[in-house]
Amino acid sequence: MKKLVIALCLMMVLAVMVEEAEARWCFRVCYRGICYRKCRGKRNEVRQYRDRGYDVRAIPDETFFTRQDEDEDDDEE
């Protein structure tokens, strides 16, 4: 019985690892008014972009390149 429980636990851990490796994490990255989609297999990449000062939001897969209003850049001139 103990071996069965251990085997089931190992199978669950393996299934989670495989699912994690195959998952695509898509998010929108915006910087200076330009937004684009990034899809990677790493969850922590979102945090890395956020730490660098980018505006990062989760988006659906069908979202494509967009450009925000130019009003943000007008302030710099």
Curated annotation (Swiss-Prot):
It comes from the Eukaryota. Keywords: Amidation, Antibiotic, Antimicrobial, Cleavage on pair of basic residues, Disulfide bond, Secreted, Signal. It is found in: Secreted. Residues 1-23 form the signal peptide. GO terms for biological process: defense response to bacterium. Hemocytes. The modification Arginine amide is found at R40. Residues 41-77 form a propeptide. Disulfide bonds join C26-C39, C30-C35. Its main location: secreted. GO terms for cellular component: extracellular region. Belongs to the tachyplesin/polyphemusin family. Significantly inhibits the growth of Gram-negative and Gram-positive bacteria. This is Tachyplesin-2. It comes from Tachypleus tridentatus (Japanese horseshoe crab).
